[in-house]
Amino acid sequence: MTNQNMPPETPIIWLNFSPALRRFDRPLLRQLGKSQAILQWDYHQTADEPNCLTVGLDLIGEYLENFHQPVHLIGHSTSGLLALLYARQCPEKVRSLSLLSVGVYPALDWQAHYYSQFDAMRYSRHLLLGQMAHHLFNCRSLRQTQTIVNILENDLLTSISPHSLYKQLIILPNHIAVPLLVAVGETDGIIDTSLFNGWQRWKKPGDRLWLCPEGKYFFQFEHPEITAFQLQQFWRSLQGQEASSSTSLLA
């Protein structure tokens, strides 16, 4: 028998604006999918489409028109940036926001790091991507390094990331009205501890900041079980608040 006084289950939506990096999300999605439904929304930018965050925000808005209640949004890196910008723009549509590898300056991502290094060092693209592969994954073989280089090179071409060799976008920290979880890898060299700790100033009661032990930029790929646990605990805490609110109204 269904308890009519309990709030309906909130849809959980994983946003992906970086199709080349999708494989690094799969272990976490599989882990989460063992206990709950996760909706995946993917954006594949075509060659003739503008690389514009506004386009991404409009598409998120169109998709969320299909839902008649606020949703849990999740995103890693640039996808997390788009989720954050949408939550700021339409907080009434978002029940909670979970950001993976997103610092307090949320536009900073691996591509921003790559382009700043490229401009400073003037290494060849292939050599610098090889260094990035080791930086992001601790590659143990030439074959593994080359595989990661190919993925990163593809991401440079297909991601909606706002950065280029000529311009790296900076978005300043700001208040986020919806419940927030920020998760960052403890040993991440892209989103370092200063970018993680900067969230403390903007943290609200009920928000959570979590450092994944020994995690790097793609910690959700390397540590899916503990990451899934943190997400589930966050969502359960919100369900508890909703249940308490329903009980108070009926008292």
Swiss-Prot record:
It comes from the Bacteria. InterPro entries: AB_hydrolase_fold (IPR029058). To Anabaena PCC 7120 alr2406. This is Uncharacterized protein sll0249. It comes from Synechocystis sp. (strain ATCC 27184 / PCC 6803 / Kazusa). The lineage of its organism: Bacteria, Bacillati, Cyanobacteriota, Cyanophyceae, Synechococcales.
